[in-house]
Amino acid sequence: AIRSALRGKNLMFTGPSGCGKTMAVMEVRKALKRPFHYMNLGSTQDPRTTLIGTREADDGTTYFKPSSFVNVIQNENSMVLLDEISRAHPEAWNILLTVLDPKQRYLQVDEAMEADKVSVADGVCFMSTANIGTDYTSARTIDRALEERFTIIEMEVLGRDDEFDLLTTLFPNVEEEKLDTIATIAAETRREAKIESKINRIISTRQSVQMAG
């Protein structure tokens, strides 16, 4: 993942809820030490304002006020996390198509052919997370054209042993008994969630890391 990011490839981390997709991106961020911008596309209600910006008037003059996304994609070697892209509004997907296309790499400010275009700076890397699996329900299926603009990294929910190994690697100074307890409880909630309909939330890998830290 780090080598792909260094080459400017777009990465999509896919997997069921709780498997540590966002945390994996954060680890890549720490390793690369690049300017970072986080966007939760799953909670975005107004894609045009969030991704492009707004037209505003002042003393009879109309001007364009760019979004923070527009500003960040003009900074070389920035990393942009498009979190929960699978839950995003389809309009957000359409806006991002040219941004993520390696042969285009621009953001069109308006639908008009003559509208201004904002070029994506060199070295900008886009990462995204997408939920899949039986625990993910949505009326939307992620656009195939958008998905093809990413290199897909498939992730699975960690088992108890793998989670314990991860925690001991991240927290070598924490007592192993504590880390073992966290990994065991997390694994048990995930197992129970598969067979018990009353359990609708699991302890995610991110939450395990937070408890350990």
Locate the predicted segments by residue.
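AAA+ P-loop NTPase catalytic core and its hallmark functional loops
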Residues: 1-180
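Conserved AAA+ ATPase small/helical "lid" subdomain
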Residues: 164-213
